[in-house]
Amino acid sequence: MKFAVIVFPGSNCDVDMFHAIKDELGEDVDYVWHDAENLDEYDAILLPGGFSYGDYLRCGAISRFANAMKAVQKAAEQGKPILGVCNGFQILVESGLLPGVLIRNQNLKFMCRTVPLRVENNETMFTSQYNKGEIIHIPIAHGEGNYYCDEATLKKLEQKNQIVFRYVDNPNGSVSDIAGIVNEKGNVLGMMPHPERAVNEILGGAEGLKVFQSILKYWRETYVVNA
């Protein structure tokens, strides 16, 4: 399996994401600059955290216009796994690939610590290696991670089982304790916590690795077994 880590000006978690795939998952991965126009050779696309374009205007607001995002849109339409973490999540909502918006944390402060999450849906290509209701501990590092959507959108997310992760002890004010959601098709996941920072016990925990193992499992079952 081959992953792409999209690198925007200001990305700073791309190395962590690359390490998670290459050294912990053991799969092929490339850094792909934001002006790339073709991602056809990749089986999964990863949008890392950071401060793309300095977070000017709004977090992710400028990145949505990058050439690579047109290719990400195409990959999403093809059903390929797309994972956006932190700033990557912000880019996904700005691009319209996921509903809602990320706003300033309720306390208006940057937060950087490990928090408990509850797995709400383990039937996605990103969470099949978890148990439903499982409590996992994943680092957060954000100033604008407060997920917001209107009541109609929230109702739709709940009805269609698109809420994948919830905070056990909401750190930022996110509506309905939301930490991560998928699109209706189930192949685009956005989450504020950083699973790539929890892939080895030496880092303090490895509970984030299952996100990437789930993607690999999906790909093998879909494209290798059926080949």
Curated annotation (Swiss-Prot):
Query: Which pathway does it operate in?
Result: Purine metabolism; IMP biosynthesis via de novo pathway; 5-amino-1-(5-phospho-D-ribosyl)imidazole from N(2)-formyl-N(1)-(5-phospho-D-ribosyl)glycinamide: step 1/2
The primary location reported for this protein is cytoplasm
Where is it located? Cytoplasm
Give the GO molecular function terms: ATP binding; glutaminase activity; phosphoribosylformylglycinamidine synthase activity
Name a biological process GO annotation. Answer: 'de novo' IMP biosynthetic process
For this protein, the record's Pfam families field holds: GATase_5 (PF13507)
Supply the EC number(s). 6.3.5.3, 3.5.1.2
Q: Which reaction does it catalyse?
A: N(2)-formyl-N(1)-(5-phospho-beta-D-ribosyl)glycinamide + L-glutamine + ATP + H2O = 2-formamido-N(1)-(5-O-phospho-beta-D-ribosyl)acetamidine + L-glutamate + ADP + phosphate + H(+); L-glutamine + H2O = L-glutamate + NH4(+)
Q: Boundaries of each Glutamine amidotransferase type-1 domain copy?
A: 3-225
Q: Which cysteines are joined by disulfide bonds?
A: none
* Keyword line: ATP-binding, Cytoplasm, Glutamine amidotransferase, Hydrolase, Ligase, Nucleotide-binding, Purine biosynthesis
Name the domain of life this protein comes from. Bacteria
Task: Note whether Protein biosynthesis occurs among the keywords.
Answer: no
Q: How does it assemble?
A: Part of the FGAM synthase complex composed of 1 PurL, 1 PurQ and 2 PurS subunits.
Protein name as catalogued:
Phosphoribosylformylglycinamidine synthase subunit PurQ
Its source organism is Bacillus cytotoxicus (strain DSM 22905 / CIP 110041 / 391-98 / NVH 391-98)
**What gene name is given for the protein in this entry?**
purQ
